[in-house]
Design a protein with these regions (language model features):
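N-terminal nucleophile
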Residues: 1-244
């Protein structure tokens, strides 16, 4: 499960993600340079199923996945859908592919899509019906949890409001502090989550400007402020065959 926030700064944007998982899950791999359908992108890879929960491509598009409840062994990993959709060159194309993909073998999820200069979009699947929200701004931050999902969402949003009250404008530093926060106390409801059976296992920070995309990744709980791994990718708006 995850907590996801973002900020737009003109055509640029920044995306922040805490990934929460049970201790029984295998650790993810560090971010990699990958290619799918001729599209280059950056993503860490899930250790169990080979998909990803967050990715950014050379068109400047980012996707962040929030699972809505556990899947079953018979279902396709939702992270593999992210790997397929991130090959699209535009947010419109991502929405189009989402609309035509057979989702019957996927458990419920919410997928955030970000593109330079455009409102964030939400693509949702509840296991029966799909939905699209063209402007997800009012929904920020996005929260999913397998334990008390409504309570976690309410408390984490309240935590962000307290952080925002300290500054007249939302800044990247505010969101960085938010994602490392234990307020009001470290536990199941805190943004940096700690439970007996699960915890926040990684923090990812994506930045996209007019020239390149950067993905910074910390394995482990973000409250520890461990040194992370960073990759960059030059943006390309030309036909893919012309991109270096």
């Amino acid at each position: 499960m995850c907590t996801v926030s973002w900020i737009h700064q003109g055509p640029a944007y920044q995306l922040f993600c805490n990934r929460d998982e049970k201790h029984t899950r295998r650790p993810a791999s560090k971010p990699q340079h990958l290619t799918r359908g001729g599209m280059r992108f950056l993503a860490p890879i899930d250790g169990d199923f080979g998909g990803t929960w967050i990715a950014v491509n050379e068109s400047g598009l980012s996707l962040a996945l929030l699972n809505r409840g556990p899947g079953s062994p018979a279902q396709i990993s939702r992270g593999l859908l992210v790997m397929n959709l991130i090959a699209a060159p535009t947010l419109t194309e991502i929405m189009s592919r989402f609309a035509t993909t057979n989702l019957s073998d996927f458990a419920a999820f919410t997928l955030l899509g970000l593109a330079p200069g455009l409102p964030a979009a939400l693509l949702a699947w509840d296991g029966r019906e799909r939905g699209v929200v063209a402007d997800a701004g009012p929904s920020m931050p996005l929260v999913s949890s397998s334990v008390d999902p409504e309570g976690c969402a309410s408390r984490r949003r309240a935590t962000l409001e307290r952080f925002r009250a300290k500054s007249p404008a939302l800044r990247p530093g505010t969101l960085l502090a938010f994602h490392r926060s234990h307020a009001p106390v470290a536990g199941a409801h805190s943004v940096c989550m700690h439970r007996d059976d699960a915890q926040t296992v990684s923090f990812t920070w994506v930045t996209v400007d007019g020239a390149e995309a950067n993905l910074y990744y910390e394995a482990g709980s973000p409250c520890r402020s461990l040194a992370g791994d960073s990759l960059s990718l030059a943006l390309c708006s030309r036909p893919q065959t012309q991109c270096a």
